[in-house]
């Protein structure tokens, strides 16, 4: 090796030792002929000092930012008052007796470690962006988590199996990335949205316990926590029940967090889907703070406010939710109340009513429409005290859940009620099997999930053996017990409006495999990128992927996607139509 130590490994215990270090010039300073260089490698920074009397001085004087250096010298203590407590190596420096410039660099277009730089520019020069020790530490966490995943699951008897990347297009919710076949003219492979069907087939193959750190692809609109290609920890096991998979996932997450320096407690809290929606307006609630939504529709059945009264009289389809904010009367001004109303309107609210809890009175636009006894019950039910404010959401239940859940989270963020150093896990269970979207029936998870009762008249009341693991308000993973009988799978396809012919065309191989003695089985997939984002306290999923895509699904570094030449298209039997003008 060209070096004896990494930069940040050096400390006071090395004073008087001859060392050789390698890295990049982070900063260069010339103080009256004495040259100071902050040398940076993956571990951190150490200060180099070169006096005018040394042979290395001429070379040191020519060094500039991002030059690649090999430096040799003796470690000494920094002078009194010259220590740098911000650096791990801030008590020492290296006095140079030899310096080699291995490579030069022009002035870099971005400052290493400067996160204020436009993200697209950072991604264009990602190889520079990744030079910071902070970036390296993120990928050290990612590596440690991957190793811990393999060790943990192997210890529990799981077999790692790789499933195909080139596969068949199947409807799993998002659009597929299609790959044209050169050999089979006019036919296409699809990149897998998940290994779902293959891992089920492995259970039918008798593999019993499977896992894979799998690359998945979805052609969907991007958000801060989405990428067109992403990684998940994929798990499937046979002859199991929901409890078995939950136990495996909890022990796995405990091992991963422990490997990354954090201990978590298991088992995790559980919450039925219906309760999560009613109490938090979300199927992935953040429980690092309390502030639940409370149903108060019954208190408005006899209200003199016609709008609230009409809403309250249809308790099956509507909701009136109260959100009591502790200390909110002091926090919210007329201006911030207006901003809160503007916020919920963006998500379908018609307005935002409220009641302020004063010392000797209740104030707000709703007070005059509610009887004194109902007001007393309201205050008691939401546990309101002097200085609090109660917000109200009223209307169709799904809309109210959504905007009141978002308001709950926004208020907690604005009032700084969330402990950023806390990890709060939660299982959401008993999901609906189906949902209606613009009149069309869809599977809430996916169509291979085991339903609890297919004979209910109202299809939206059918629940499934499905479960999501949530961490700090982010869905970390989801899974289910799978359908293992072809008759049930065919019935689910039928309820989803998938014809017998379509089911045969798209899933014939699965239906046939199910008919050959498929065992009861189930599994879970945990979003690996999201997990690392939370473990490393990163702001975006793009920070934890070495070469991510932008929110426009492009790569500024390689300029992908790009056009290809006509010869390549001809080989694939493809002709690109010019966009009509």
UniProtKB/Swiss-Prot annotation:
Gene: aspS
Protein function: Aspartyl-tRNA synthetase with relaxed tRNA specificity since it is able to aspartylate not only its cognate tRNA(Asp) but also tRNA(Asn). Reaction proceeds in two steps: L-aspartate is first activated by ATP to form Asp-AMP and then transferred to the acceptor end of tRNA(Asp/Asn).
Subunit structure: Homodimer.
Organism whose genome encodes this protein: Helicobacter hepaticus (strain ATCC 51449 / 3B1)
Protein name: Aspartate--tRNA(Asp/Asn) ligase
InterPro entries: Aa-tRNA-synt_II, aa-tRNA-synth_II, aa-tRNA-synth_II/BPL/LPL, Asp-tRNA-ligase_1, Asp-tRNA-ligase_1_N, Asp/Asn-tRNA-synth_IIb, AspRS_core, GAD-like_sf
Family: Belongs to the class-II aminoacyl-tRNA synthetase family. Type 1 subfamily.
EC number: 6.1.1.23
Gene Ontology molecular function: aspartate-tRNA ligase activity; aspartate-tRNA(Asn) ligase activity; ATP binding; nucleic acid binding
């Amino acid at each position: 090796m060209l070096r004896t130590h990494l930069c940040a490994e050096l400390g006071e215990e090395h004073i008087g030792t001859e060392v050789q270090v390698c890295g990049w010039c982070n900063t260069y300073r010339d103080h009256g002929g004495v040259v100071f260089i902050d040398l940076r490698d993956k571990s951190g920074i150490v200060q180099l000092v070169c006096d005018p009397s040394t042979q290395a001085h001429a070379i040191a004087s020519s060094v500039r930012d991002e030059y690649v250096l090999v430096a040799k010298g003796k470690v000494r203590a920094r002078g009194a008052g010259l220590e740098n407590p911000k650096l791990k190596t801030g008590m020492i420096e290296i006095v140079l007796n030899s310096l080699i410039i291995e490579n030069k660099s022009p002035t870099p277009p971005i400052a290493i470690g400067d996160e204020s730089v436009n993200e697209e520019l950072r991604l264009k020069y990602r190889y520079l962006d990744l030079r910071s020790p902070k970036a390296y530490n993120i990928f050290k966490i990612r590596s440690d988590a991957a190793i811990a995943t393999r060790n943990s699951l192997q210890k529990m008897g799981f077999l790692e199996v790789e499933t195909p990347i080139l596969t068949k297009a199947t409807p799993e919710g998002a659009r597929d990335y299609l790959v044209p076949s050169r050999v089979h003219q006019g036919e296409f492979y699809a990149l897998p949205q998940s290994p779902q069907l293959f891992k089920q087939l492995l259970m039918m193959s008798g593999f019993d316990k499977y896992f894979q750190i799998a690359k998945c692809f979805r052609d969907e609109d991007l958000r801060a926590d989405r990428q067109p290609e992403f990684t998940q920890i994929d798990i499937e096991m046979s002859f199991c029940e929901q409890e078995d998979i939950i136990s495996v996932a909890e022990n796995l997450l405990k091992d991963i967090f422990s490997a990354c320096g954090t201990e978590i407690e298991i088992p995790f809290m559980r919450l039925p889907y219906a309760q999560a929606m009613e109490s938090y307006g979300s199927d992935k609630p953040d429980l690092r703070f309390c502030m639940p939504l409370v149903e108060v529709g019954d208190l408005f059945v006899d209200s003199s406010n016609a709008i609230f009264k009409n809403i309250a009289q249809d308790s099956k389809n509507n909701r009136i939710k109260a959100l009591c904010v502790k200390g909110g009367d002091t926090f919210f001004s007329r201006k911030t109340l207006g901003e809160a109303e503007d916020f919920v309107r963006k998500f379908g609210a018609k307005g935002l009513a409220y009641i302020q809890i004063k010392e000797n009175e209740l104030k707000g636009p709703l007070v005059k429409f509610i009887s004194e006894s109902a007001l007393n019950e309201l205050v008691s039910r939401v546990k309101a005290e002097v200085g609090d404010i109660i917000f109200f959401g009223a209307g169709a239940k799904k809309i109210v859940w959504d905007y009141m859940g978002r308001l709950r989270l926004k208020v907690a963020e604005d009032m700084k009620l969330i402990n950023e150093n806390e990890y709060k896990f939660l299982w959401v269970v008993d999901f609906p099997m189906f949902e209606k979207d613009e009149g069309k029936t869809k599977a809430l998870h996916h169509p291979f999930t085991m339903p609890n009762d297919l004979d209910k008249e109202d299809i939206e009341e059918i629940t499934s053996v499905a479960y999501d693991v949530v961490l700090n308000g982010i869905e970390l993973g989801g899974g289910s017990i799978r359908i293992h009988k072809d008759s049930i799978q065919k019935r689910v396809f039928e309820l989803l409006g998938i014809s017998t012919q379509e089911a045969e065309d798209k899933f014939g191989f699965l239906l046939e495999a199910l008919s050959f003695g498929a065992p009861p089985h189930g599994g879970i997939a945990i979003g690996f990128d999201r997990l690392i984002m939370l473990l490393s306290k990163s702001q975006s999923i793009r920070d934890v992927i070495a070469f991510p895509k932008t929110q426009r699904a492009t790569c500024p570094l390689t300029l992908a996607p790009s056009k290809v030449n006509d010869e390549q298209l001809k080989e694939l039997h493809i002709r690109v139509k010019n966009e009509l003008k």
